[in-house]
Amino acid sequence: MLVIRLIACTFLFITPSLLAKPFPAERIISLAPHATEIAYAAGLGDKLVAVSEYSDYPPQALELERVANHQTINIEKILTLKPDLIIAWPAGNPPRELAKLRQLGFTIYDSQTKTLDEIADNIEALSHYSANPEVGQKAAHDFRQRLQDLRTQYASNQPIRYFYQLSEKPIITLAQGHWPSEVFSLCGGVNIFADSEVPYPQVSIEQVLVKQPQVIFTSEHAIANGHMWRAWQAELSAVQNDQVWALNADWLNRPTPRTLDAVEQVCTYLKIAQKQ
């Protein structure tokens, strides 16, 4: 359930906001794995002094001190580190502790993303905190160009029904309009639970059987799920046709430049399914 909490929190949307005029920051703390990646993309990696748990990309982030996780923020440690910029995650950071940081007067940038285009916006906005903003601006430009190329490349993909499984016990998926559903729709994917009234519905095997997805996606965090579906081979065409795929969860669930790697991965698998 920890994985689901981390993923679900990422999907919530708050427009990136700047609480103060951007300035070249010298000591930066990131409070979320995706924010750490965005900081590096924006050219701020050498200014990071601490990050959150699970900040494992790029590899040099592993060497930084940990000051936050999904349950808590170590405010005492942050005070000793004296950051001049904190990259926060309002949808995932503990709200009471985040509010305390604001009350203490820290400059905070709220990093949130709902769409693929907003990943580039996030990088670009953070680049203004760098002494060399052209680094982040180029990264944002390159992201937008690659995204446009992918949209053009896969624009003719035929619609295909998919099921994305986030966890096994309980079985949780996502509704349309919540991260990362745009990754699938760009590739021609049609979410079989798109009309769910809740963002991350808990569903039963029987519901999946009734909706008959042509492709089943699982995450690497739930790799055993692929084996779980083998028991239903006689009743699921996706299993019969070997269309059960494990996706790179970090690429897919973190809104960062690597999300475009997830787009290519998903599009490749859906293309295979469309040929059957």
Curated annotation (Swiss-Prot):
What CDD domains does this protein's entry cite? BtuF (cd01144)
Indicate where this protein resides in the cell.
Answer: Periplasm
Signal peptide positions on this chain? 1-20
Entry-linked PROSITE patterns: FE_B12_PBP (PS50983)
State a single Gene Ontology molecular function: cobalamin binding
Describe its assembly.
The complex is composed of two ATP-binding proteins (BtuD), two transmembrane proteins (BtuC) and a solute-binding protein (BtuF).
Coiled-coil ranges per UniProt: none
**Main localization of the protein described in the UniProt heading:** periplasm
Name the family the entry cites: Belongs to the BtuF family.
Main function: Part of the ABC transporter complex BtuCDF involved in vitamin B12 import. Binds vitamin B12 and delivers it to the periplasmic surface of BtuC.
Keyword terms: Disulfide bond, Periplasm, Signal, Transport
What biological-process terms (Gene Ontology) are attached? Answer: cobalamin transport
| GO cellular component terms attached to this protein's record | periplasmic space
Q: Which cysteines are joined by disulfide bonds?
A: C187-C267
Site, as annotated: Important for BtuC binding: E76, E206
Gene transcribed to yield this protein: btuF
Q: Describe the location of the Fe/B12 periplasmic-binding domain by residue ranges.
A: 27-274
Q: Where does cyanocob(III)alamin bind?
A: Y54
The protein depicted here goes by the name Vitamin B12-binding protein
Q: Which HAMAP family does UniProt cross-reference here?
A: BtuF (MF_01000)
Q: Organism, per UniProt?
A: Vibrio cholerae serotype O1 (strain ATCC 39541 / Classical Ogawa 395 / O395)
